């Protein structure tokens, strides 16, 4: 729960921040999401334009449906990171990192929590295949494999280790954010390997079934990190108060995915920009009602955690269904 402060100056709250030497209009950034062309024919180009217009940070997915140069052109200098599904073939990994560096990416986000695909029973029943290609990775796959995520995941490395974090950092020379740690032990392993940041996520609840909500893991991760490196948070963010609570719980940046794709589907780049603007406006309102003037103020807020102890009726008659 947010415990508001009173008798505070909240006339002109600001969400602007400086992160890694870059000025951003908000701590709300674009999460890596695959296959934007499923939502809009312009795909990642439209998303990148919307993020650029808003003035935030864009994270490119390995499974984008637009190639790197086109995304970079649409971003027009907006800071951008690359989300990396690590291949079993180090030659492929080196080539992708060479391309990423050439396009001016500022960091690499290593996805460590989804080296295989989840059991998507609906997709199996529907016989779903991608109707669009994924140019960043498909040149390395067997002919026709780009239409099936099974082939894509089979090319991903399942034997990930801290050494892979070291390899990416050494070869690319870029900061490496490890995406997926939800406990203290994984944080320590990542930092010992040279990670420059931790990305807390449960992959939007789309992979392992029965895992914790990402927000429930954030406090433990933040305590383990102890401000040694930045923390990015995603999964389940739908309102400005969610952003506020994540920042107050230890996150430095809050990434959104599904809401952006909804905006992309409905309004292209304008829809993307408006999703960010709407969430940011909500964040400002929550800041004013809580007594926070800046994002630094928000990050020093203490949330009140009330225990959740549900009780369930034993007698079905207590359900009062009739």
Task: List the model feature ranges, each with a label.
Residues 53-93:
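A gly/proline- and charged-residue-enriched helix-loop-helix capping module
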